[in-house]
């Protein structure tokens, strides 16, 4: 894979670009923090689990939807999936599908998320329209 930055410009490159350029493995805990920051506005509560072990290959995220449902999510290179129906609890017998994005996963779990995300998108488009862009 080709990256549009030189090694001396790594400080200007995104995290994903640095990982590709340096041949590094992504730290799933950092990825999980980015996921949380990206959609926190559209859920009641969301945070990286401090009680379940996270590392380079897996991280766990606790999320409470606007409907009050709680989930424990597993984040790996394969994507995100529900692994429990309460915070910090992995149910090994639970069989759920991986989602490539947090948006897809939350869209399948929470009508409130869908509404909040849609409203935020409309507000942003309206601001762009008002600014003449």
Curated annotation (Swiss-Prot):
Is Ribosomal protein found in the keyword set? no
Q: Where in the cell is it found?
A: Cytoplasm
Q: Pfam families in the record, alphabetically?
A: GSKIP_dom
Q: Which GO terms describe its cellular component?
A: cytoplasm
Q: Name one GO molecular function term.
A: protein kinase A binding
Gene3D superfamilies for the chain: Hypothetical protein (hspc210)
Annotated InterPro entries: GSKIP (IPR037395), GSKIP_dom (IPR007967), GSKIP_dom_sf (IPR023231)
What GO terms in the biological process aspect are recorded for it? regulation of canonical Wnt signaling pathway; regulation of Wnt signaling pathway
**Where is this chain primarily localised?**
cytoplasm
Q: Which UniProt keywords are present, listed alphabetically?
A: Cytoplasm
Can you tell me where the transmembrane regions are? none
Family matches, as SUPFAM superfamilies: Hypothetical protein c14orf129, hspc210
Task: Give the UniProt family note.
Answer: Belongs to the GSKIP family.
Stated name of the protein: GSK3-beta interaction protein
Please give the organism.
Danio rerio
Write the gene name: gskip
